[in-house]
């Protein structure tokens, strides 16, 4: 009985963790602008169109810059974003395996 209760608790903890992780992805994009309605003033429509333009520019913006090679990606994962680190291992390190 205790083993079954423990498995349910682990399942509930996993579900809560998944919900927390998924909620963090919900904030990845800005909220869509809301339409001002059919009988809005021209100024409200101008603000709405500016907000839509800004929204589209944010979600479709280009990613400029040099694409990294797989070696650079592995070095970034190993050494972090610090560019002062060498991508190659140190020479005094010898792998004994």
Swiss-Prot record:
GO biological process, one term: neuropeptide signaling pathway
Annotated keywords: Amidation, Cleavage on pair of basic residues, Hormone, Neuropeptide, Secreted, Signal
Stored InterPro entries: Pancreatic_hormone-like (IPR001955), Pancreatic_hormone-like_CS (IPR020392)
Pfam families, per the entry: Hormone_3
GO terms, molecular function: neuropeptide hormone activity; neuropeptide Y receptor binding
Disulfide-linked positions: none
PROSITE patterns, alphabetized: PANCREATIC_HORMONE_1, PANCREATIC_HORMONE_2
Gene Ontology CC terms, in alphabetical order: extracellular space
Localization: Secreted
The UniProt record lists the keyword Cell membrane: no
Keyword hit for Secreted: yes
Signal peptide from the UniProt entry: 1-28
Highest taxon of the lineage: Eukaryota
Tyrosine amide PTM positions: 64
CDD domains referenced in this protein's UniProt entry, alphabetically: PAH
Residue stretch(es) of the prosequence: 68-97
PANTHER family according to UniProt: NEUROPEPTIDE Y/PANCREATIC HORMONE/PEPTIDE YY, PEPTIDE YY-RELATED
Family under the similarity heading: Belongs to the NPY family.
Name this protein carries in UniProt: Peptide Y
Source organism of the structure: Dicentrarchus labrax
Organism placement in taxonomy: Eukaryota, Metazoa, Chordata, Craniata, Vertebrata
């Amino acid at each position: 009985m205790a083993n079954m209760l423990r498995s349910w608790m682990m399942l509930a903890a996993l579900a809560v963790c998944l919900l927390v992780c998924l909620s963090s992805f919900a904030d990845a994009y800005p909220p869509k602008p809301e339409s001002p309605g059919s009988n809005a003033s021209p100024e409200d429509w101008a603000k709405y169109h500016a907000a839509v333009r800004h929204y589209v520019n944010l979600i479709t913006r280009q990613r400029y810059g040099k694409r990294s090679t797989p070696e650079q990606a592995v070095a970034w994962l190993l050494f972090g974003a610090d560019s002062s680190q060498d991508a190659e291992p140190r020479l005094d390190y010898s792998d004994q395996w």
